[in-house]
Amino acid sequence: MKILLVLQGAWIAPRFDLATEVLIIKIDDQGNRTGEPREILLPGPSAEELCSLILKEGITHVICGGIEEAHYRYLTWKGLKVMDHIIGTGREVVHHFLARGELDPETVMR
């Protein structure tokens, strides 16, 4: 699987459509990271460009804060698992995701 975290600095970005950076991590069938995580700086905030990047990269799971219903429906229609309303640092969220294999909506890392 390939997960994409929508970031703002070290934290999950509060809004999908305002993100300017993402982190892509590959996970094998045993739940272990494979390869090096890849951080991509986006040229500017754009939900449409972010959706295009997600599809181009073959992402299977998206972890984000808030996301507009239209973008959520589009990504799920394309077969992606979208875990939204997540709050925490990228590091905490990845650790929690790897331990559990998923995140419940509205998960808050403290």
Where are these regions (language model features)?
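Short, glycine/polar-rich helix-capping loops at beta-to-alpha or helix-loop-helix junctions
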Residues: 67-72
